[in-house]
């Protein structure tokens, strides 16, 4: 029935307890090294998973075939500048005069799926900024050129012209890179098979090497550096600025709890507020005091984090050694909250076939393992207009049909709601 694919929808009812487990807090720390040169992948259950240099990679491409995200490592000195003087036909005549007035773009710090190259979609429905989706080949074909600055601020700083040629239907990314004068013109393929079970595949253009950055999916948090919009008091503008912060793995959810002492938190109030936010933990737990030249920590700021395994943890920070040591100190506590979890393949349920065949039926596949549960399916178009809805009862392995007859080609959102839990998937009808 599922065509050799497993789709799971598991909802474990929330526990009735309102307080965290009555146990001691566990103190822990991670070491990013002097100068904060390293990043640390961390599991709330098992501690540090792996440590590696922040500067190893320069480009990252999604492992999700229905996504098109390309991220840049800004901390390693990578800058992405949109080329305004032509499309890919201008490759041979690439002209950098006046480039300092061109638009520089950065990764989104909240959405895993928005990198510097696809931060803002283009004017067309299938335009993802760096490329356009081809419904016949199911590829994203690059239609834009970029100026890449590698190693900005270092003696080895270089300028490259860059062309994301295409993302093929297997999820590989083919890119073309050359010096501005056209020399050293090289095409690389970032292969999906090189990063099986990971969020991204990574590449270092300078060294012409594939990079193995991520460990397996057995991590929840990443202690690293990233560029965040930061208010600059000198210019009065908000500018991208490198900060040391904590990113979340895909599937790790969190919510910041302000103004409540950690031992008085009513967990059931916040359980349904956890959300998917790349920097949901982030960097706001610390502030550098310009008077004392020391870091100050928010005593009443605690994070409720739902880990990859579905367990809920409380987390608060107690110290940061800055660039002198790179050590981060924190306390964590596993709660007695039961998990509200969509398990397996990402968040666990899915729509298939996707892309759909226009006029044919698509299906939502679910598998509820904990009794009957009321739910609803809702489908909306790109403008948010409802085109289909159905109330359903989830109970065991099921599939629900959604007719697409009469629907125009486009990108649609299909939402599955049960109680306070709402999850959304995108459906493409070519």
Describe these PLM feature segments:
Residues 23-336:
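Surface-exposed, beta-sheet-biased, low-hydrophobicity segments with strongly acidic/polar composition
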Residues 184-186, 385-391, 422:
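Surface-exposed loop/edge segments in extracytoplasmic proteins
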Residues 364, 391-419, 428:
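Short, surface-exposed loop/turn motifs with a glycine/proline- and acidic-biased composition
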Residues 18-22:
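Sec/Tat signal peptide C-region and signal peptidase I cleavage site
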Residues 378-387, 412:
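Short, glycine-anchored, charge-dense loop/turn motifs used at functional sites
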Residues 1-6, 430:
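Positively charged n-region of N-terminal signal peptides that target proteins for export
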Residues 331-352, 358-359, 363, 367-369, ...:
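Residue-level detector of functionally pivotal "anchor" positions at catalytic/ligand-binding pockets or at interdomain
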Residues 6-15:
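Sec-dependent N-terminal signal peptides
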């Amino acid at each position: 029935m599922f065509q050799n694919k497993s789709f799971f929808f598991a909802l474990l009812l929330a526990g009735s307890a309102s307080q965290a487990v009555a146990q001691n807090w566990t103190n822990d720390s991670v070491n990013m090294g002097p100068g904060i040169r390293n990043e640390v992948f961390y599991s709330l259950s098992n501690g540090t998973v792996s440590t590696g240099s922040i500067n190893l990679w320069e480009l990252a491409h999604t492992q999700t075939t229905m996504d098109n995200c390309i991220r840049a490592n800004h901390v390693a000195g990578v800058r992405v500048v949109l080329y305004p003087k032509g499309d890919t036909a201008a490759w041979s005549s690439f002209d950098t005069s006046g480039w300092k007035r061109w638009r520089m773009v950065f990764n989104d710090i909240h959405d895993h799926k928005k990198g510097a190259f696809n931060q803002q979609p283009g004017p067309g429905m299938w335009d993802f900024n760096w490329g356009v989706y081809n419904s016949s080949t199911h590829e994203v074909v690059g239609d834009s050129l970029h100026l890449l600055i590698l190693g900005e601020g270092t003696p080895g700083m270089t300028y490259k012209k860059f062309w994301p040629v295409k993302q093929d239907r297997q999820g590989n990314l083919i890119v073309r890179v050359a010096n501005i004068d056209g020399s050293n013109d090289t095409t690389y393929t970032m292969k999906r098979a090189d990063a099986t079970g990971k969020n991204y595949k990574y590449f270092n253009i300078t060294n012409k090497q594939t990079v193995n950055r991520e460990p397996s999916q057995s991590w929840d948090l990443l202690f690293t550096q990233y560029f965040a919009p930061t208010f600059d008091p000198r210019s009065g503008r908000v500018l991208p600025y490198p900060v040391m912060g904590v990113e979340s793995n895909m599937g790790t959810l969190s919510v910041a709890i302000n103004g409540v002492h950690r031992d008085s938190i009513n967990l059931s109030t916040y359980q349904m507020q956890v959300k998917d936010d790349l920097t949901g933990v982030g960097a706001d737990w610390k502030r550098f005091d310009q008077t004392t030249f020391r870091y100050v920590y928010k005593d009443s700021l605690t994070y409720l984090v739902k880990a990859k395994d579905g367990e809920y943890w409380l987390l608060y920070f107690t110290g940061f050694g800055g660039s002198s040591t790179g050590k981060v100190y924190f306390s964590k506590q596993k709660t007695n909250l039961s998990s509200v979890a969509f398990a397996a393949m990402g968040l666990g349920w899915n729509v298939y076939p996707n892309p759909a065949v226009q006029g044919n039926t698509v299906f939502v596949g679910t598998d509820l393992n904990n009794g009957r549960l009321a739910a609803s399916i809702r489908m909306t178009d790109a403008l948010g207009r409802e085109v289909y809805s159905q109330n359903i009862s989830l109970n065991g392995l099921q599939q629900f049909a959604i007719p697409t007859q009469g629907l125009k080609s486009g990108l649609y959102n299909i939402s599955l709601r049960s109680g306070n839990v709402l999850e959304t998937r995108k459906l493409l009808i070519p």
